[in-house]
């Protein structure tokens, strides 16, 4: 028999989250961002639920080809553009839209000889300082791109650094509007946080990522309470052993947790080789939350490669075989991430290939039925 650990991707939750985004930005078209294999959920697994988007945004050419193989005929945006001149032929073959963010990409594009015009998104650096043309250079870059016979439509694009924080986006929107003033073309500015909290930046296209998967851009689940977003990934396992501890007994590598009273602990078939964070706290003030038999409890001790331990005090009837939820419905991934010094994005993307993954599919009645991925 296989180990009892299993991840579930919930297609109804994905479809719901796309609907939430539509309601938040009713006048914008939606790029569903599926980079990093759909934030660890799997492009194949999420496609059916997200095909109601207006387009898909990603990084990898192979993932773009996969979307075409799955039957997607709509727009696909390469968020980092291309890296080699030979990539341009594939962009044309698979009818992709490409970001252009630097002089090197413009030079490669100038040397290209595609048979038809390519759709591009010209990226403006408004303060993130990763990719994009400086505002003082942007108009010249646009004019250069506009003069190329191989360039069709040009969308103006930027990315917000603080849409989820107190600094906000006003300074970046101001820089964007100044740099693109009187230039024709649509605009794409909003990431997940801007979709939720900055409607003035929605413009023609929005690019939601983390909220498609039901987690918070801030890393705090409380910040998306009331939005209607639902977790699209859950991670489950079972207790494989139970231990009785006496005061002074310690748990796990490094003996970081010491029992202060008689207590029962459960051993769960899940460890850092499955993608659960090794740095999740099982000692001190803020221990990582876990559900056992649907009851909330906490980690004890250090997470090891294949196992972790939990306090069974709140669930005295728990036994070997009792179900465990590591994150998912009833236990937001952001809470686990906070107790691990990271963000939900990282936990999603870190789910290990050895974890069996099933899909709760969308049916005609909009109910969920399990299917093997």
Swiss-Prot record:
GO cellular component annotations of the record: cytosol
Cofactor(s) needed by this chain: pyridoxal 5'-phosphate
Pathway(s) where this gene product acts: Amino-acid biosynthesis; D-alanine biosynthesis; D-alanine from L-alanine: step 1/1
CDD domains according to UniProt: PLPDE_III_AR_proteobact (cd06827)
Residues bearing the modification N6-(pyridoxal phosphate)lysine: 35
Keywords, comma-separated and alphabetical: Isomerase, Pyridoxal phosphate
EC number: 5.1.1.1
Residues that hold substrate according to the record: 130, 305
Pfam families tied to this protein: Ala_racemase_C, Ala_racemase_N
One MF annotation (Gene Ontology) recorded for this entry: pyridoxal phosphate binding
InterPro entries named among the record's database cross-references: Ala_racemase (IPR000821), Ala_racemase/Decarboxylase_C (IPR009006), Ala_racemase_C (IPR011079), Ala_racemase_N (IPR001608), Ala_racemase_pyridoxalP-BS (IPR020622), PLP-binding_barrel (IPR029066)
Catalytic activity: L-alanine = D-alanine
Active site, per annotation: 35, 253
Protein role: Catalyzes the interconversion of L-alanine and D-alanine. May also act on other amino acids.
Family, as annotated: Belongs to the alanine racemase family.
HAMAP family: Ala_racemase (MF_01201)
NCBIfam families noted in UniProt: alr
Protein name: Alanine racemase
UniProt gene name: alr
